[in-house]
């Protein structure tokens, strides 16, 4: 029997320091994707690269925006008042999630600092939850569909949006002893670890919560072992680590300041500004030239770089530029953008989405079984084949031609 514990945003050195049970297992750092959590989850559950599963960011340019209705209300898209935008975001999210039209983990986020005139140009990359049978079904098979197709008795704990601190702890108790005896696999989703890291960084609040999670994993392992007549194994992992941000005023980059230096405004161009990625789409060559000129200024200051073909090849980011971004600037750690689609960033102490090679960005992989000696670092691509191997679904590994490797001895 396999117990998989996913913890969002737990970094390797904090696991070693504050999670003694997990640290006592076989452990390796895990290398993240060059993107945010939505890209990581898609890679974890499909065993495919970003340019294969095609989820890089939550938002992409497209025709199926949940905000299309804004354009139908006369003059509404020109009313860029923050309280109004927050209200429109809240109402739209409620309508789409309550109706079941969108069940994705993200829901329908508010595009806080993006002018309303652009909202209708963007759609969600994922519209349903990762364990929905239709998720990525047109492209490949996901972990959850493989479980269903092979009649693996399983339970999924706390995999839903608006994750709260104790959800996994509480929801795990609904599995009775009788049900535990039937099961081959349990997937536990612990998403609040990422919230704690964003809010508190490496401070004591995060450390205390990690210890609580560690105790929960240990107690669940012991509870299942007492009941199940099968050999019980653990795989515990995160999608990425966290990097402590420089929260001084100089480190919070308002990209529009650089456009102003050139006599421009960032919102003259179709854009999505996130924590450390700025994406642009162009209506003509002049716009492209003007944006590129500004982004080169940021490059010359050593703040980051425009993502070029070499970077796309290295990190498997050869996606459709018309949807994901025709020009993308990456802002390097420990800085972040302010005035983004997510808000203003002033209260965020720790972040992710940075180059996967940053040591503080390494996530965790912990296992009761020994990991192959030659494996120094784990890739998110390895999660699916290792899980299927543990469930004795090796034929599926061969058929799917997964990109990762099996990690166990």
Annotate each language-model stretch with its function:
Residues 1, 16, 39, 138-145, ...:
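A structural signal for well-ordered alpha-helical segments within the folded catalytic domains
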Residues 1-3, 183-187, 231-233, 326:
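Residue-level preference for the first positions of well-ordered beta-strands
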Residues 3-7, 12, 21, 212-254, ...:
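Metal-dependent active-site segment of extracytoplasmic phospho-/sulfohydrolases and closely related
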Residues 12-15, 52-54, 163-166, 195-198, ...:
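Short catalytic/ligand-binding loop motif for oxyanion handling, primarily in non-cytosolic enzymes
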Residues 13-61:
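Short, structured active-site-proximal loop/turn typified by the sulfatase FGly-forming signature C/S-X-P-X-R
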Residues 48-203, 212, 272, 290, ...:
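His/Asp/Glu-rich, glycine-adjacent segments
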Residues 242-283:
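Acidic/histidine-rich catalytic neighborhood
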Residues 270-390, 404:
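Active-site neighborhoods of enzymes that stabilize oxyanions during catalysis
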């Amino acid at each position: 029997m396999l117990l998989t514990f996913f913890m969002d945003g737990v970094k390797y050195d904090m696991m070693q320091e504050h999670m003694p049970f997990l640290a006592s297992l076989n452990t390796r750092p895990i290398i993240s994707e060059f993107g945010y959590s939505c890209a990581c989850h898609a890679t974890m559950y499909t065993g495919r690269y970003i340019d294969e599963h095609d989820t890089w960011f939550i938002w992409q340019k497209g025709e199926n925006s949940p905000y299309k209705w804004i354009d139908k209300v006369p003059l509404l898209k020109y009313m860029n008042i923050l309280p109004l935008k927050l209200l429109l975001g809240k109402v739209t999210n409620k309508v789409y999630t309550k109706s079941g039209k969108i069940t994705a983990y993200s829901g329908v986020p508010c595009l806080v600092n993006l002018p309303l005139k652009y909202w209708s140009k963007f759609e969600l990359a994922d519209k349903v939850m990762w364990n929905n049978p239709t998720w990525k079904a047109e492209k490949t098979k996901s972990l959850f569909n493989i479980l269903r197709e092979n009649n693996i008795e399983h339970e999924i704990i706390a995999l839903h949006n608006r994750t709260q601190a104790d959800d996994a702890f509480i929801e795990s108790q609904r599995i009775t002893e009788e049900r535990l005896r039937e099961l081959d696999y349990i997937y536990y989703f612990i998403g609040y670890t990422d919230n704690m890291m964003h809010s508190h960084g490496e401070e004591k609040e995060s450390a205390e919560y990690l210890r609580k999670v560690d105790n929960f994993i240990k107690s669940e392992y012991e509870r299942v072992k007492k009941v199940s007549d099968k050999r019980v194994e653990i795989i515990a992992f995160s999608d990425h680590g966290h990097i402590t941000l420089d929260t001084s005023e100089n480190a919070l980059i308002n990209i529009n300041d650089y456009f102003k230096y050139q006599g421009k405004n960032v919102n003259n161009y179709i854009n999505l500004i996130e924590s450390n990625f700025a994406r642009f789409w162009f209506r003509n060559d002049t716009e492209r030239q003007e944006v590129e000129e500004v982004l080169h200024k940021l490059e010359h200051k050593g703040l980051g770089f425009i993502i070029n073909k070499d970077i796309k090849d290295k990190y498997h980011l050869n996606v459709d530029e018309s949807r994901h971004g025709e020009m993308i600037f990456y802002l390097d750690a420990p800085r972040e953008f302010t005035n983004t689609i997510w808000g203003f960033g002033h209260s965020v102490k720790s972040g992710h989405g940075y180059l996967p090679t940053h040591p503080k960005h390494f996530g965790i992989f912990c296992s009761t079984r020994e990991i192959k000696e030659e494996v120094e670092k784990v890739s998110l691509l390895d999660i699916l084949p290792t899980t299927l191997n543990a469930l004795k679904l090796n034929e599926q590994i061969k058929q799917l031609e997964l990109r990762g490797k099996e990690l166990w001895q």
